[in-house]
């Protein structure tokens, strides 16, 4: 009997170990916003020139061509969707460029110190941009990574990643400008803030705050989508900046999420910077009613 028990144990133990290993390797399902499946992405790997892709945008919300910038080079890139070959125009020298938006026929590029570069979208095919305008000292001092342009209202929204009073107030502050296309001017049109204290108390984000890295808006619901690479979360807020939900992102799928945009089919796109082991990429999530 002892020999029989020993033989049973001899065969059962390896089976149990194998079962445990298989269970560990099973894909963990992460939460998704309503209408999207963050466990089922269409992945577009970037070329080496866009390893540090830091912002994405679409022209008139058309998803066939993606426009982007990367962290260090003052270049405005364009690619057909799922076409790795990129073309670009030079709009500035090397610096720290964090986000991009296209407002009708004008491109907006945000530098980390809050300086905004604008130039005609029509110049995207030129080797170098000729008609560039730079807006300095129009934002409160701080670090900025998020810009969104509303084609219907001609308004531009910017979020502060690190601003003096935000940590103390447990809030995230932002600024609104209206763009005068004819005069090529940004007119101050208000400020806003979002209370992040609840997220801090629930330990959904760090005590240092949300640290927004990208911003976009659902044109149908008016809801704001705010990405935080530091906290690995996507926050969805009401049109008046009240937090509605916080989506925890899978760090193995979202390596360093820095860019965010919708197309006219309501597909949601999130770009990720690459590193020594992986290429930069853009993840597309199709909308499911």
Language-model features: where?
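Bacterial Sec-dependent N-terminal signal peptides
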Residues: 1-34
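Sequence/structural signature of beta-propeller domains
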Residues: 24-289
């Amino acid at each position: 009997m002892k020999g029989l028990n020993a033989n049973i144990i001899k065969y059962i133990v390896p089976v149990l170990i194998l079962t445990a290993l298989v269970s560990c390797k099973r894909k963990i399902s992460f939460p998704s916003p309503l209408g999207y499946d963050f466990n089922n992405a269409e992945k577009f790997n970037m070329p080496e020139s866009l390893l540090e892709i830091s912002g994405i945008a679409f022209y008139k919300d058309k998803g066939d061509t993606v426009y982007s910038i990367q962290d260090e080079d003052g270049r405005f890139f364009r690619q057909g969707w799922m076409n790795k070959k990129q073309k670009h125009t030079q709009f500035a020298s090397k610096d720290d460029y964090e986000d991009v938006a296209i407002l009708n026929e004008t491109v907006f590029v945000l530098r980390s110190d809050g300086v905004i570069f604008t130039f005609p979208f029509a110049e995207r095919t030129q080797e170098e941009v000729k008609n560039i305008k730079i807006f300095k000292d129009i934002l409160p001092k701080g670090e900025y990574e998020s810009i969104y342009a509303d084609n219907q209202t001609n308004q531009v929204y910017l979020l502060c990643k690190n601003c003096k009073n935000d940590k103390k107030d447990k809030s995230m502050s932002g600024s609104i400008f209206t763009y005068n296309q004819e005069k090529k001017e940004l007119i101050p049109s208000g400020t806003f803030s979002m209370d992040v204290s609840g997220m801090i108390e629930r330990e959904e984000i760090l005590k240092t705050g949300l640290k927004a890295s990208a911003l976009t808006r659902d044109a149908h619901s008016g809801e704001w989508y705010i990405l935080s690479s530091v906290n690995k979360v996507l926050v969805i807020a009401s049109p008046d900046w009240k937090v509605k939900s916080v989506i925890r992102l899978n760090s193995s799928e979202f390596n360093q999420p820095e860019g965010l945009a919708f197309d006219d089919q309501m597909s949601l796109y999130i770009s990720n910077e690459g590193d020594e082991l992986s290429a930069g990429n853009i993840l597309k999530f199709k909308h499911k009613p």
